[in-house]
């Protein structure tokens, strides 16, 4: 699909950057020769817009071998960022998709500044081409034909091999994010814990990873009472899924991802209202993020050891379901007083974290659609983070900045630990109250990470979008897939 060339050839469409600046760029000046000065006229008349994310289409009318040009406004160079580029190109690729373009090129060097080099631009362009044109996988009987971009050429004076490598990495990041999106969008009667486990096994076998899928009996033997409690009301069997990627000869410095895999959450006996229940098929967004990251890792083969653990079940009401006031025993041996059955994700993750440690994880990152409280605190564009290790958190933060997936650190104080440890009947309680809800959930998980360096990522606000945006349609976003993979790719770098 991807090609790298030094000069333009015949294409259906070519993408060119336009910045707000006094002098027209050399790229536009060169094109303007073929247009006999008409591009400059269009700029002066403001029919070619340089404003951020503005897209101006110009037909060549036979003056060049290119059928039409798409000029992408990027605003002022001093305010140009990777986020600006991602949004602008996402919108551009949506436009090309709507026009059914199958052969496109990008004047890569026209997007290069002191802040962004050609490798950055190539990576982002390939990544965003997949993200921006993603479509929901629906179950409608009347399916529309989809025209795909079949050929994408980067025009650049830079080293072709380096640009090709960046295009490949970007493409893999975008495709895996879309894989996670598709999982989150699947209905809960289709994506059960069993189906999620089957998907994970197929992924592991495709990329020659080791894997384990624990059944209920094995969980009972290991004492996974927290996950099993959540599963008590369900006819669907629970699964504890583990994928093991060995990127080094020695099994050291192992990064452990733990993704919440609640395939549907009714709230249990702490029942959600109807409006709060619809959409809870997405409560396995953390599991999807982890599997998306493992897809990238499998494709790119970084020299790093990684474990992915997914505790999976649904949380439903029945005569056998767990109840408020129950006391359960987790795999760690710590007992938990259940005050809220709708705080089930942290129970499943507690056993997932302990299991990841048992498998050898030296670092832990859990990802979960965990609390509505994080949405109240941070909105729908920022993931909440908590940690017991600032050095590990800084690496996660740097990865998130590289991928433009915003995260913000929330605190854990001793008084927060006291609240989750406040129980007359058990070591911990799973829901101390509404105040500081997001912080309480993360603090609870920290009790199971213990001294292992750990970062908690609450993606309840960022896992799904209520409306279409530059990088995709309404629905699942694939939040944190690219950040997790980038963390592994960059882990330990100075």
Curated annotation (Swiss-Prot):
One Gene Ontology CC term in the entry: cytoplasm
The protein's Enzyme Commission number: 3.4.11.1, 3.4.11.10
Catalytic activity field: Release of an N-terminal amino acid, Xaa-|-Yaa-, in which Xaa is preferably Leu, but may be other amino acids including Pro although not Arg or Lys, and Yaa may be Pro. Amino acid amides and methyl esters are also readily hydrolyzed, but rates on arylamides are exceedingly low; Release of an N-terminal amino acid, preferentially leucine, but not glutamic or aspartic acids
Localization, UniProt: Cytoplasm
An example Gene Ontology molecular-function term: manganese ion binding
Cofactor stoichiometry and binding remark: Binds 2 manganese ions per subunit.
Residues forming the catalytic site: 272, 346
Main location: cytoplasm
Family note: Belongs to the peptidase M17 family.
Function comment: Presumably involved in the processing and regular turnover of intracellular proteins. Catalyzes the removal of unsubstituted N-terminal amino acids from various peptides.
Protein name: Probable cytosol aminopeptidase
């Amino acid at each position: 699909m991807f090609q790298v060339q030094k000069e333009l050839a015949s294409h259906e469409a070519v993408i060119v950057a336009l910045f707000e600046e006094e002098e027209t760029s050399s790229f536009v000046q060169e094109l303007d020769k073929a247009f006999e000065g008409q591009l400059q006229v269009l700029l002066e008349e403001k029919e070619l817009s340089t404003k951020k994310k503005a897209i101006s289409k110009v037909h060549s009318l036979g003056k060049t071998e290119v059928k039409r040009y798409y000029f992408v406004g990027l605003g002022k160079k001093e305010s140009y960022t990777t986020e600006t580029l991602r949004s602008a190109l996402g919108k551009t690729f949506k436009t090309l998709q709507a026009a059914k373009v199958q052969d496109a090129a990008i004047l890569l060097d026209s997007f290069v500044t002191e802040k962004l080099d050609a490798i950055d631009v190539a990576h982002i362009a390939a990544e965003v081409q997949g993200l921006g044109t993603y479509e929901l996988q629906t179950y409608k009987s009347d399916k529309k034909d989809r025209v795909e971009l079949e050929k994408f050429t980067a025009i650049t004076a830079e080293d072709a091999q380096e640009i090709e490598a960046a295009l490949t990495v970007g493409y893999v990041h975008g495709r895996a994010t879309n894989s996670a999106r598709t999982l989150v969008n699947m209905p809960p009667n289709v994506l059960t814990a069993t189906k999620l486990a089957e998907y994970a096994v197929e992924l592991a076998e495709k990329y020659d990873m080791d894997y384990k899928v624990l059944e209920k009996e094995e969980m009972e033997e290991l004492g996974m009472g927290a996950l099993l409690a959540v599963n008590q009301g369900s006819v669907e069997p629970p699964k504890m899924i583990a994928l093991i990627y060995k990127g080094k000869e020695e099994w050291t410095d192992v990064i452990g991802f733990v993704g919440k895999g609640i395939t549907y959450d009714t709230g249990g006996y702490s029942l959600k209202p109807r409006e709060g229940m619809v959409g809870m098929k997405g409560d396995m967004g953390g599991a999807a993020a982890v599997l998306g990251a493992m897809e990238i890792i499998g494709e790119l083969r970084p020299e790093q050891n990684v474990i992915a653990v997914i505790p999976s079940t649904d949380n439903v009401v029945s005569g056998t379901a767990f109840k408020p006031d129950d006391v359960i025993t987790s795999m760690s041996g710590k007992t938990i007083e259940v005050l809220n059955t709708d705080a089930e994700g942290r129970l499943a993750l507690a056993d997932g974290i302990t299991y990841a440690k048992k498998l050898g994880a030296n670092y832990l990152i859990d990802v979960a659609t965990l609390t509505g409280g994080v949405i109240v605190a941070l909105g729908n564009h920022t993931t909440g983070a908590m940690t017991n290790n600032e050095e590990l958190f800084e690496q996660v933060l740097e990865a998130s900045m590289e991928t433009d997936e915003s995260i913000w650190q929330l605190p854990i104080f001793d008084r927060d630990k006291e609240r989750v440890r406040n129980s007359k009947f058990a070591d911990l309680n799973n829901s101390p109250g509404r105040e500081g809800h997001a912080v309480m959930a993360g603090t609870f998980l920290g009790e199971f990470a213990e001294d292992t360096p750990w970062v908690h990522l609450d993606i309840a606000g960022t896992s799904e979008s209520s409306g279409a945006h530059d990088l995709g349609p309404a629905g699942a976003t694939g939040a944190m897939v690219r950040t997790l993979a980038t963390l592994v790719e960059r882990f330990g770098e100075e």
